[in-house]
């Protein structure tokens, strides 16, 4: 099966990004043909500084490769290196109803807040559909709140088929594990919007300080506690093995257990868990030419597939 996933280069990944999405879709490279792209064209709707965008794109590539994306198993490339995608966007846009775009979440939310939504945001779902259809993608891993994008993609492909005949592979959404929601430093869902994230990469000492400042309740140390209702324990579970998790749960239930101990434990297991990725990233940072070669090779393969798909679309709609 062919899997497609994109990551926006708009900021550095945090624990929630990793466990809620990145790890899950990287795992799909083992038994599928993976196409993973860095969505720099999409990022232009929010990132307007050229140097920042260039830096973000390279950081996204370094992050994905360090976290386990294997270029011998999957194709990693930059969205703007595939001009066929922007051409396909136009072919799809000529048959896209305005009402469909007006109903899409991102546009509706921005409009509801009284913010100005530009044409880039308005037509964002069409570019996303082109991203998916250009590679004959069969599986697209998404969060529950992103399923609408796949539905829109299928609708646009269906409209094109109705007008010009069968052309595209219709993708299916693979919903990511909703149980993989990661609590932030304040106990809410980890999100940049809440300013409660813990980064995957960065100074270990600084991250440890952030962990030690995680908000807890004011229950006395001697009181027994329910581990399943505690966000520090939920973080610990992400990294520790079954035996370690059970031992920690028993300490919670027994009482006489301070939050300082679990904070130190979270810091230790998370540092150990991400240590190989941090080492890999440092290695890649010292050899950026290799990273560029990986992106170029991924783009070469992606263009071969996209060119074939767009050629079908051109012929079917009368441009060839």
UniProtKB/Swiss-Prot annotation:
Positions bound to ATP: 8-10, 16-17, 143-145, 182, 189-193
Record-level GO BP terms: tryptophanyl-tRNA aminoacylation
Residues holding L-tryptophan: 131
Class of enzymatic activity (EC top level): ligase
Ranges spanned by the short sequence motif 'KMSKS' region, renumbered to the chain: 189-193
Family: Belongs to the class-I aminoacyl-tRNA synthetase family.
Entry protein name: Tryptophan--tRNA ligase
Organism per entry: Rhodopirellula baltica (strain DSM 10527 / NCIMB 13988 / SH1)
